[in-house]
UniProtKB/Swiss-Prot annotation:
GO terms for molecular function: rRNA binding; structural constituent of ribosome. Signal peptide: none annotated. It comes from the Bacteria. InterPro entries: Ribosomal_uS8 (IPR000630), Ribosomal_uS8_CS (IPR047863), Ribosomal_uS8_sf (IPR035987). Belongs to the universal ribosomal protein uS8 family. Part of the 30S ribosomal subunit. Contacts proteins S5 and S12. This is Small ribosomal subunit protein uS8.
Amino acid sequence: MVLTDPIADFLTRIRNANMAKHDSVEIPASNIKKSLTEILKQEGFIRDYEVTEDGKQGVIKITLKYGPNGERVISGLKRISKPGLRNYVSADNLPKVLNGLGIAIVSTSAGILTDKEAREKNVGGEVIAYVW
């Protein structure tokens, strides 16, 4: 199966597993997906992840996080910059998601960062996704 947008597939797999209240989800690995997963872990949206090599590209197993009463930690995931319509912003125009309650994930020259980290480093880039 050929994917035209592997990042959208990554976000959709997490969104679907989260909505179905699965404990974990397995996603084909890539360097960008590993960076996105690390940001989700740092920001507290997922419990943990593990990368296993399968002889091809590898698999990322993400353990999802839920509240004490089973409520979802991830309320929403939205792909912003798509292959058909890229969305670039300067450091001055970095978006705030829900007035700071969510995060924007930005691909910059300094790597893949959250909107807050990009503001601190004063770099702009391509807005990959919003997570709240």
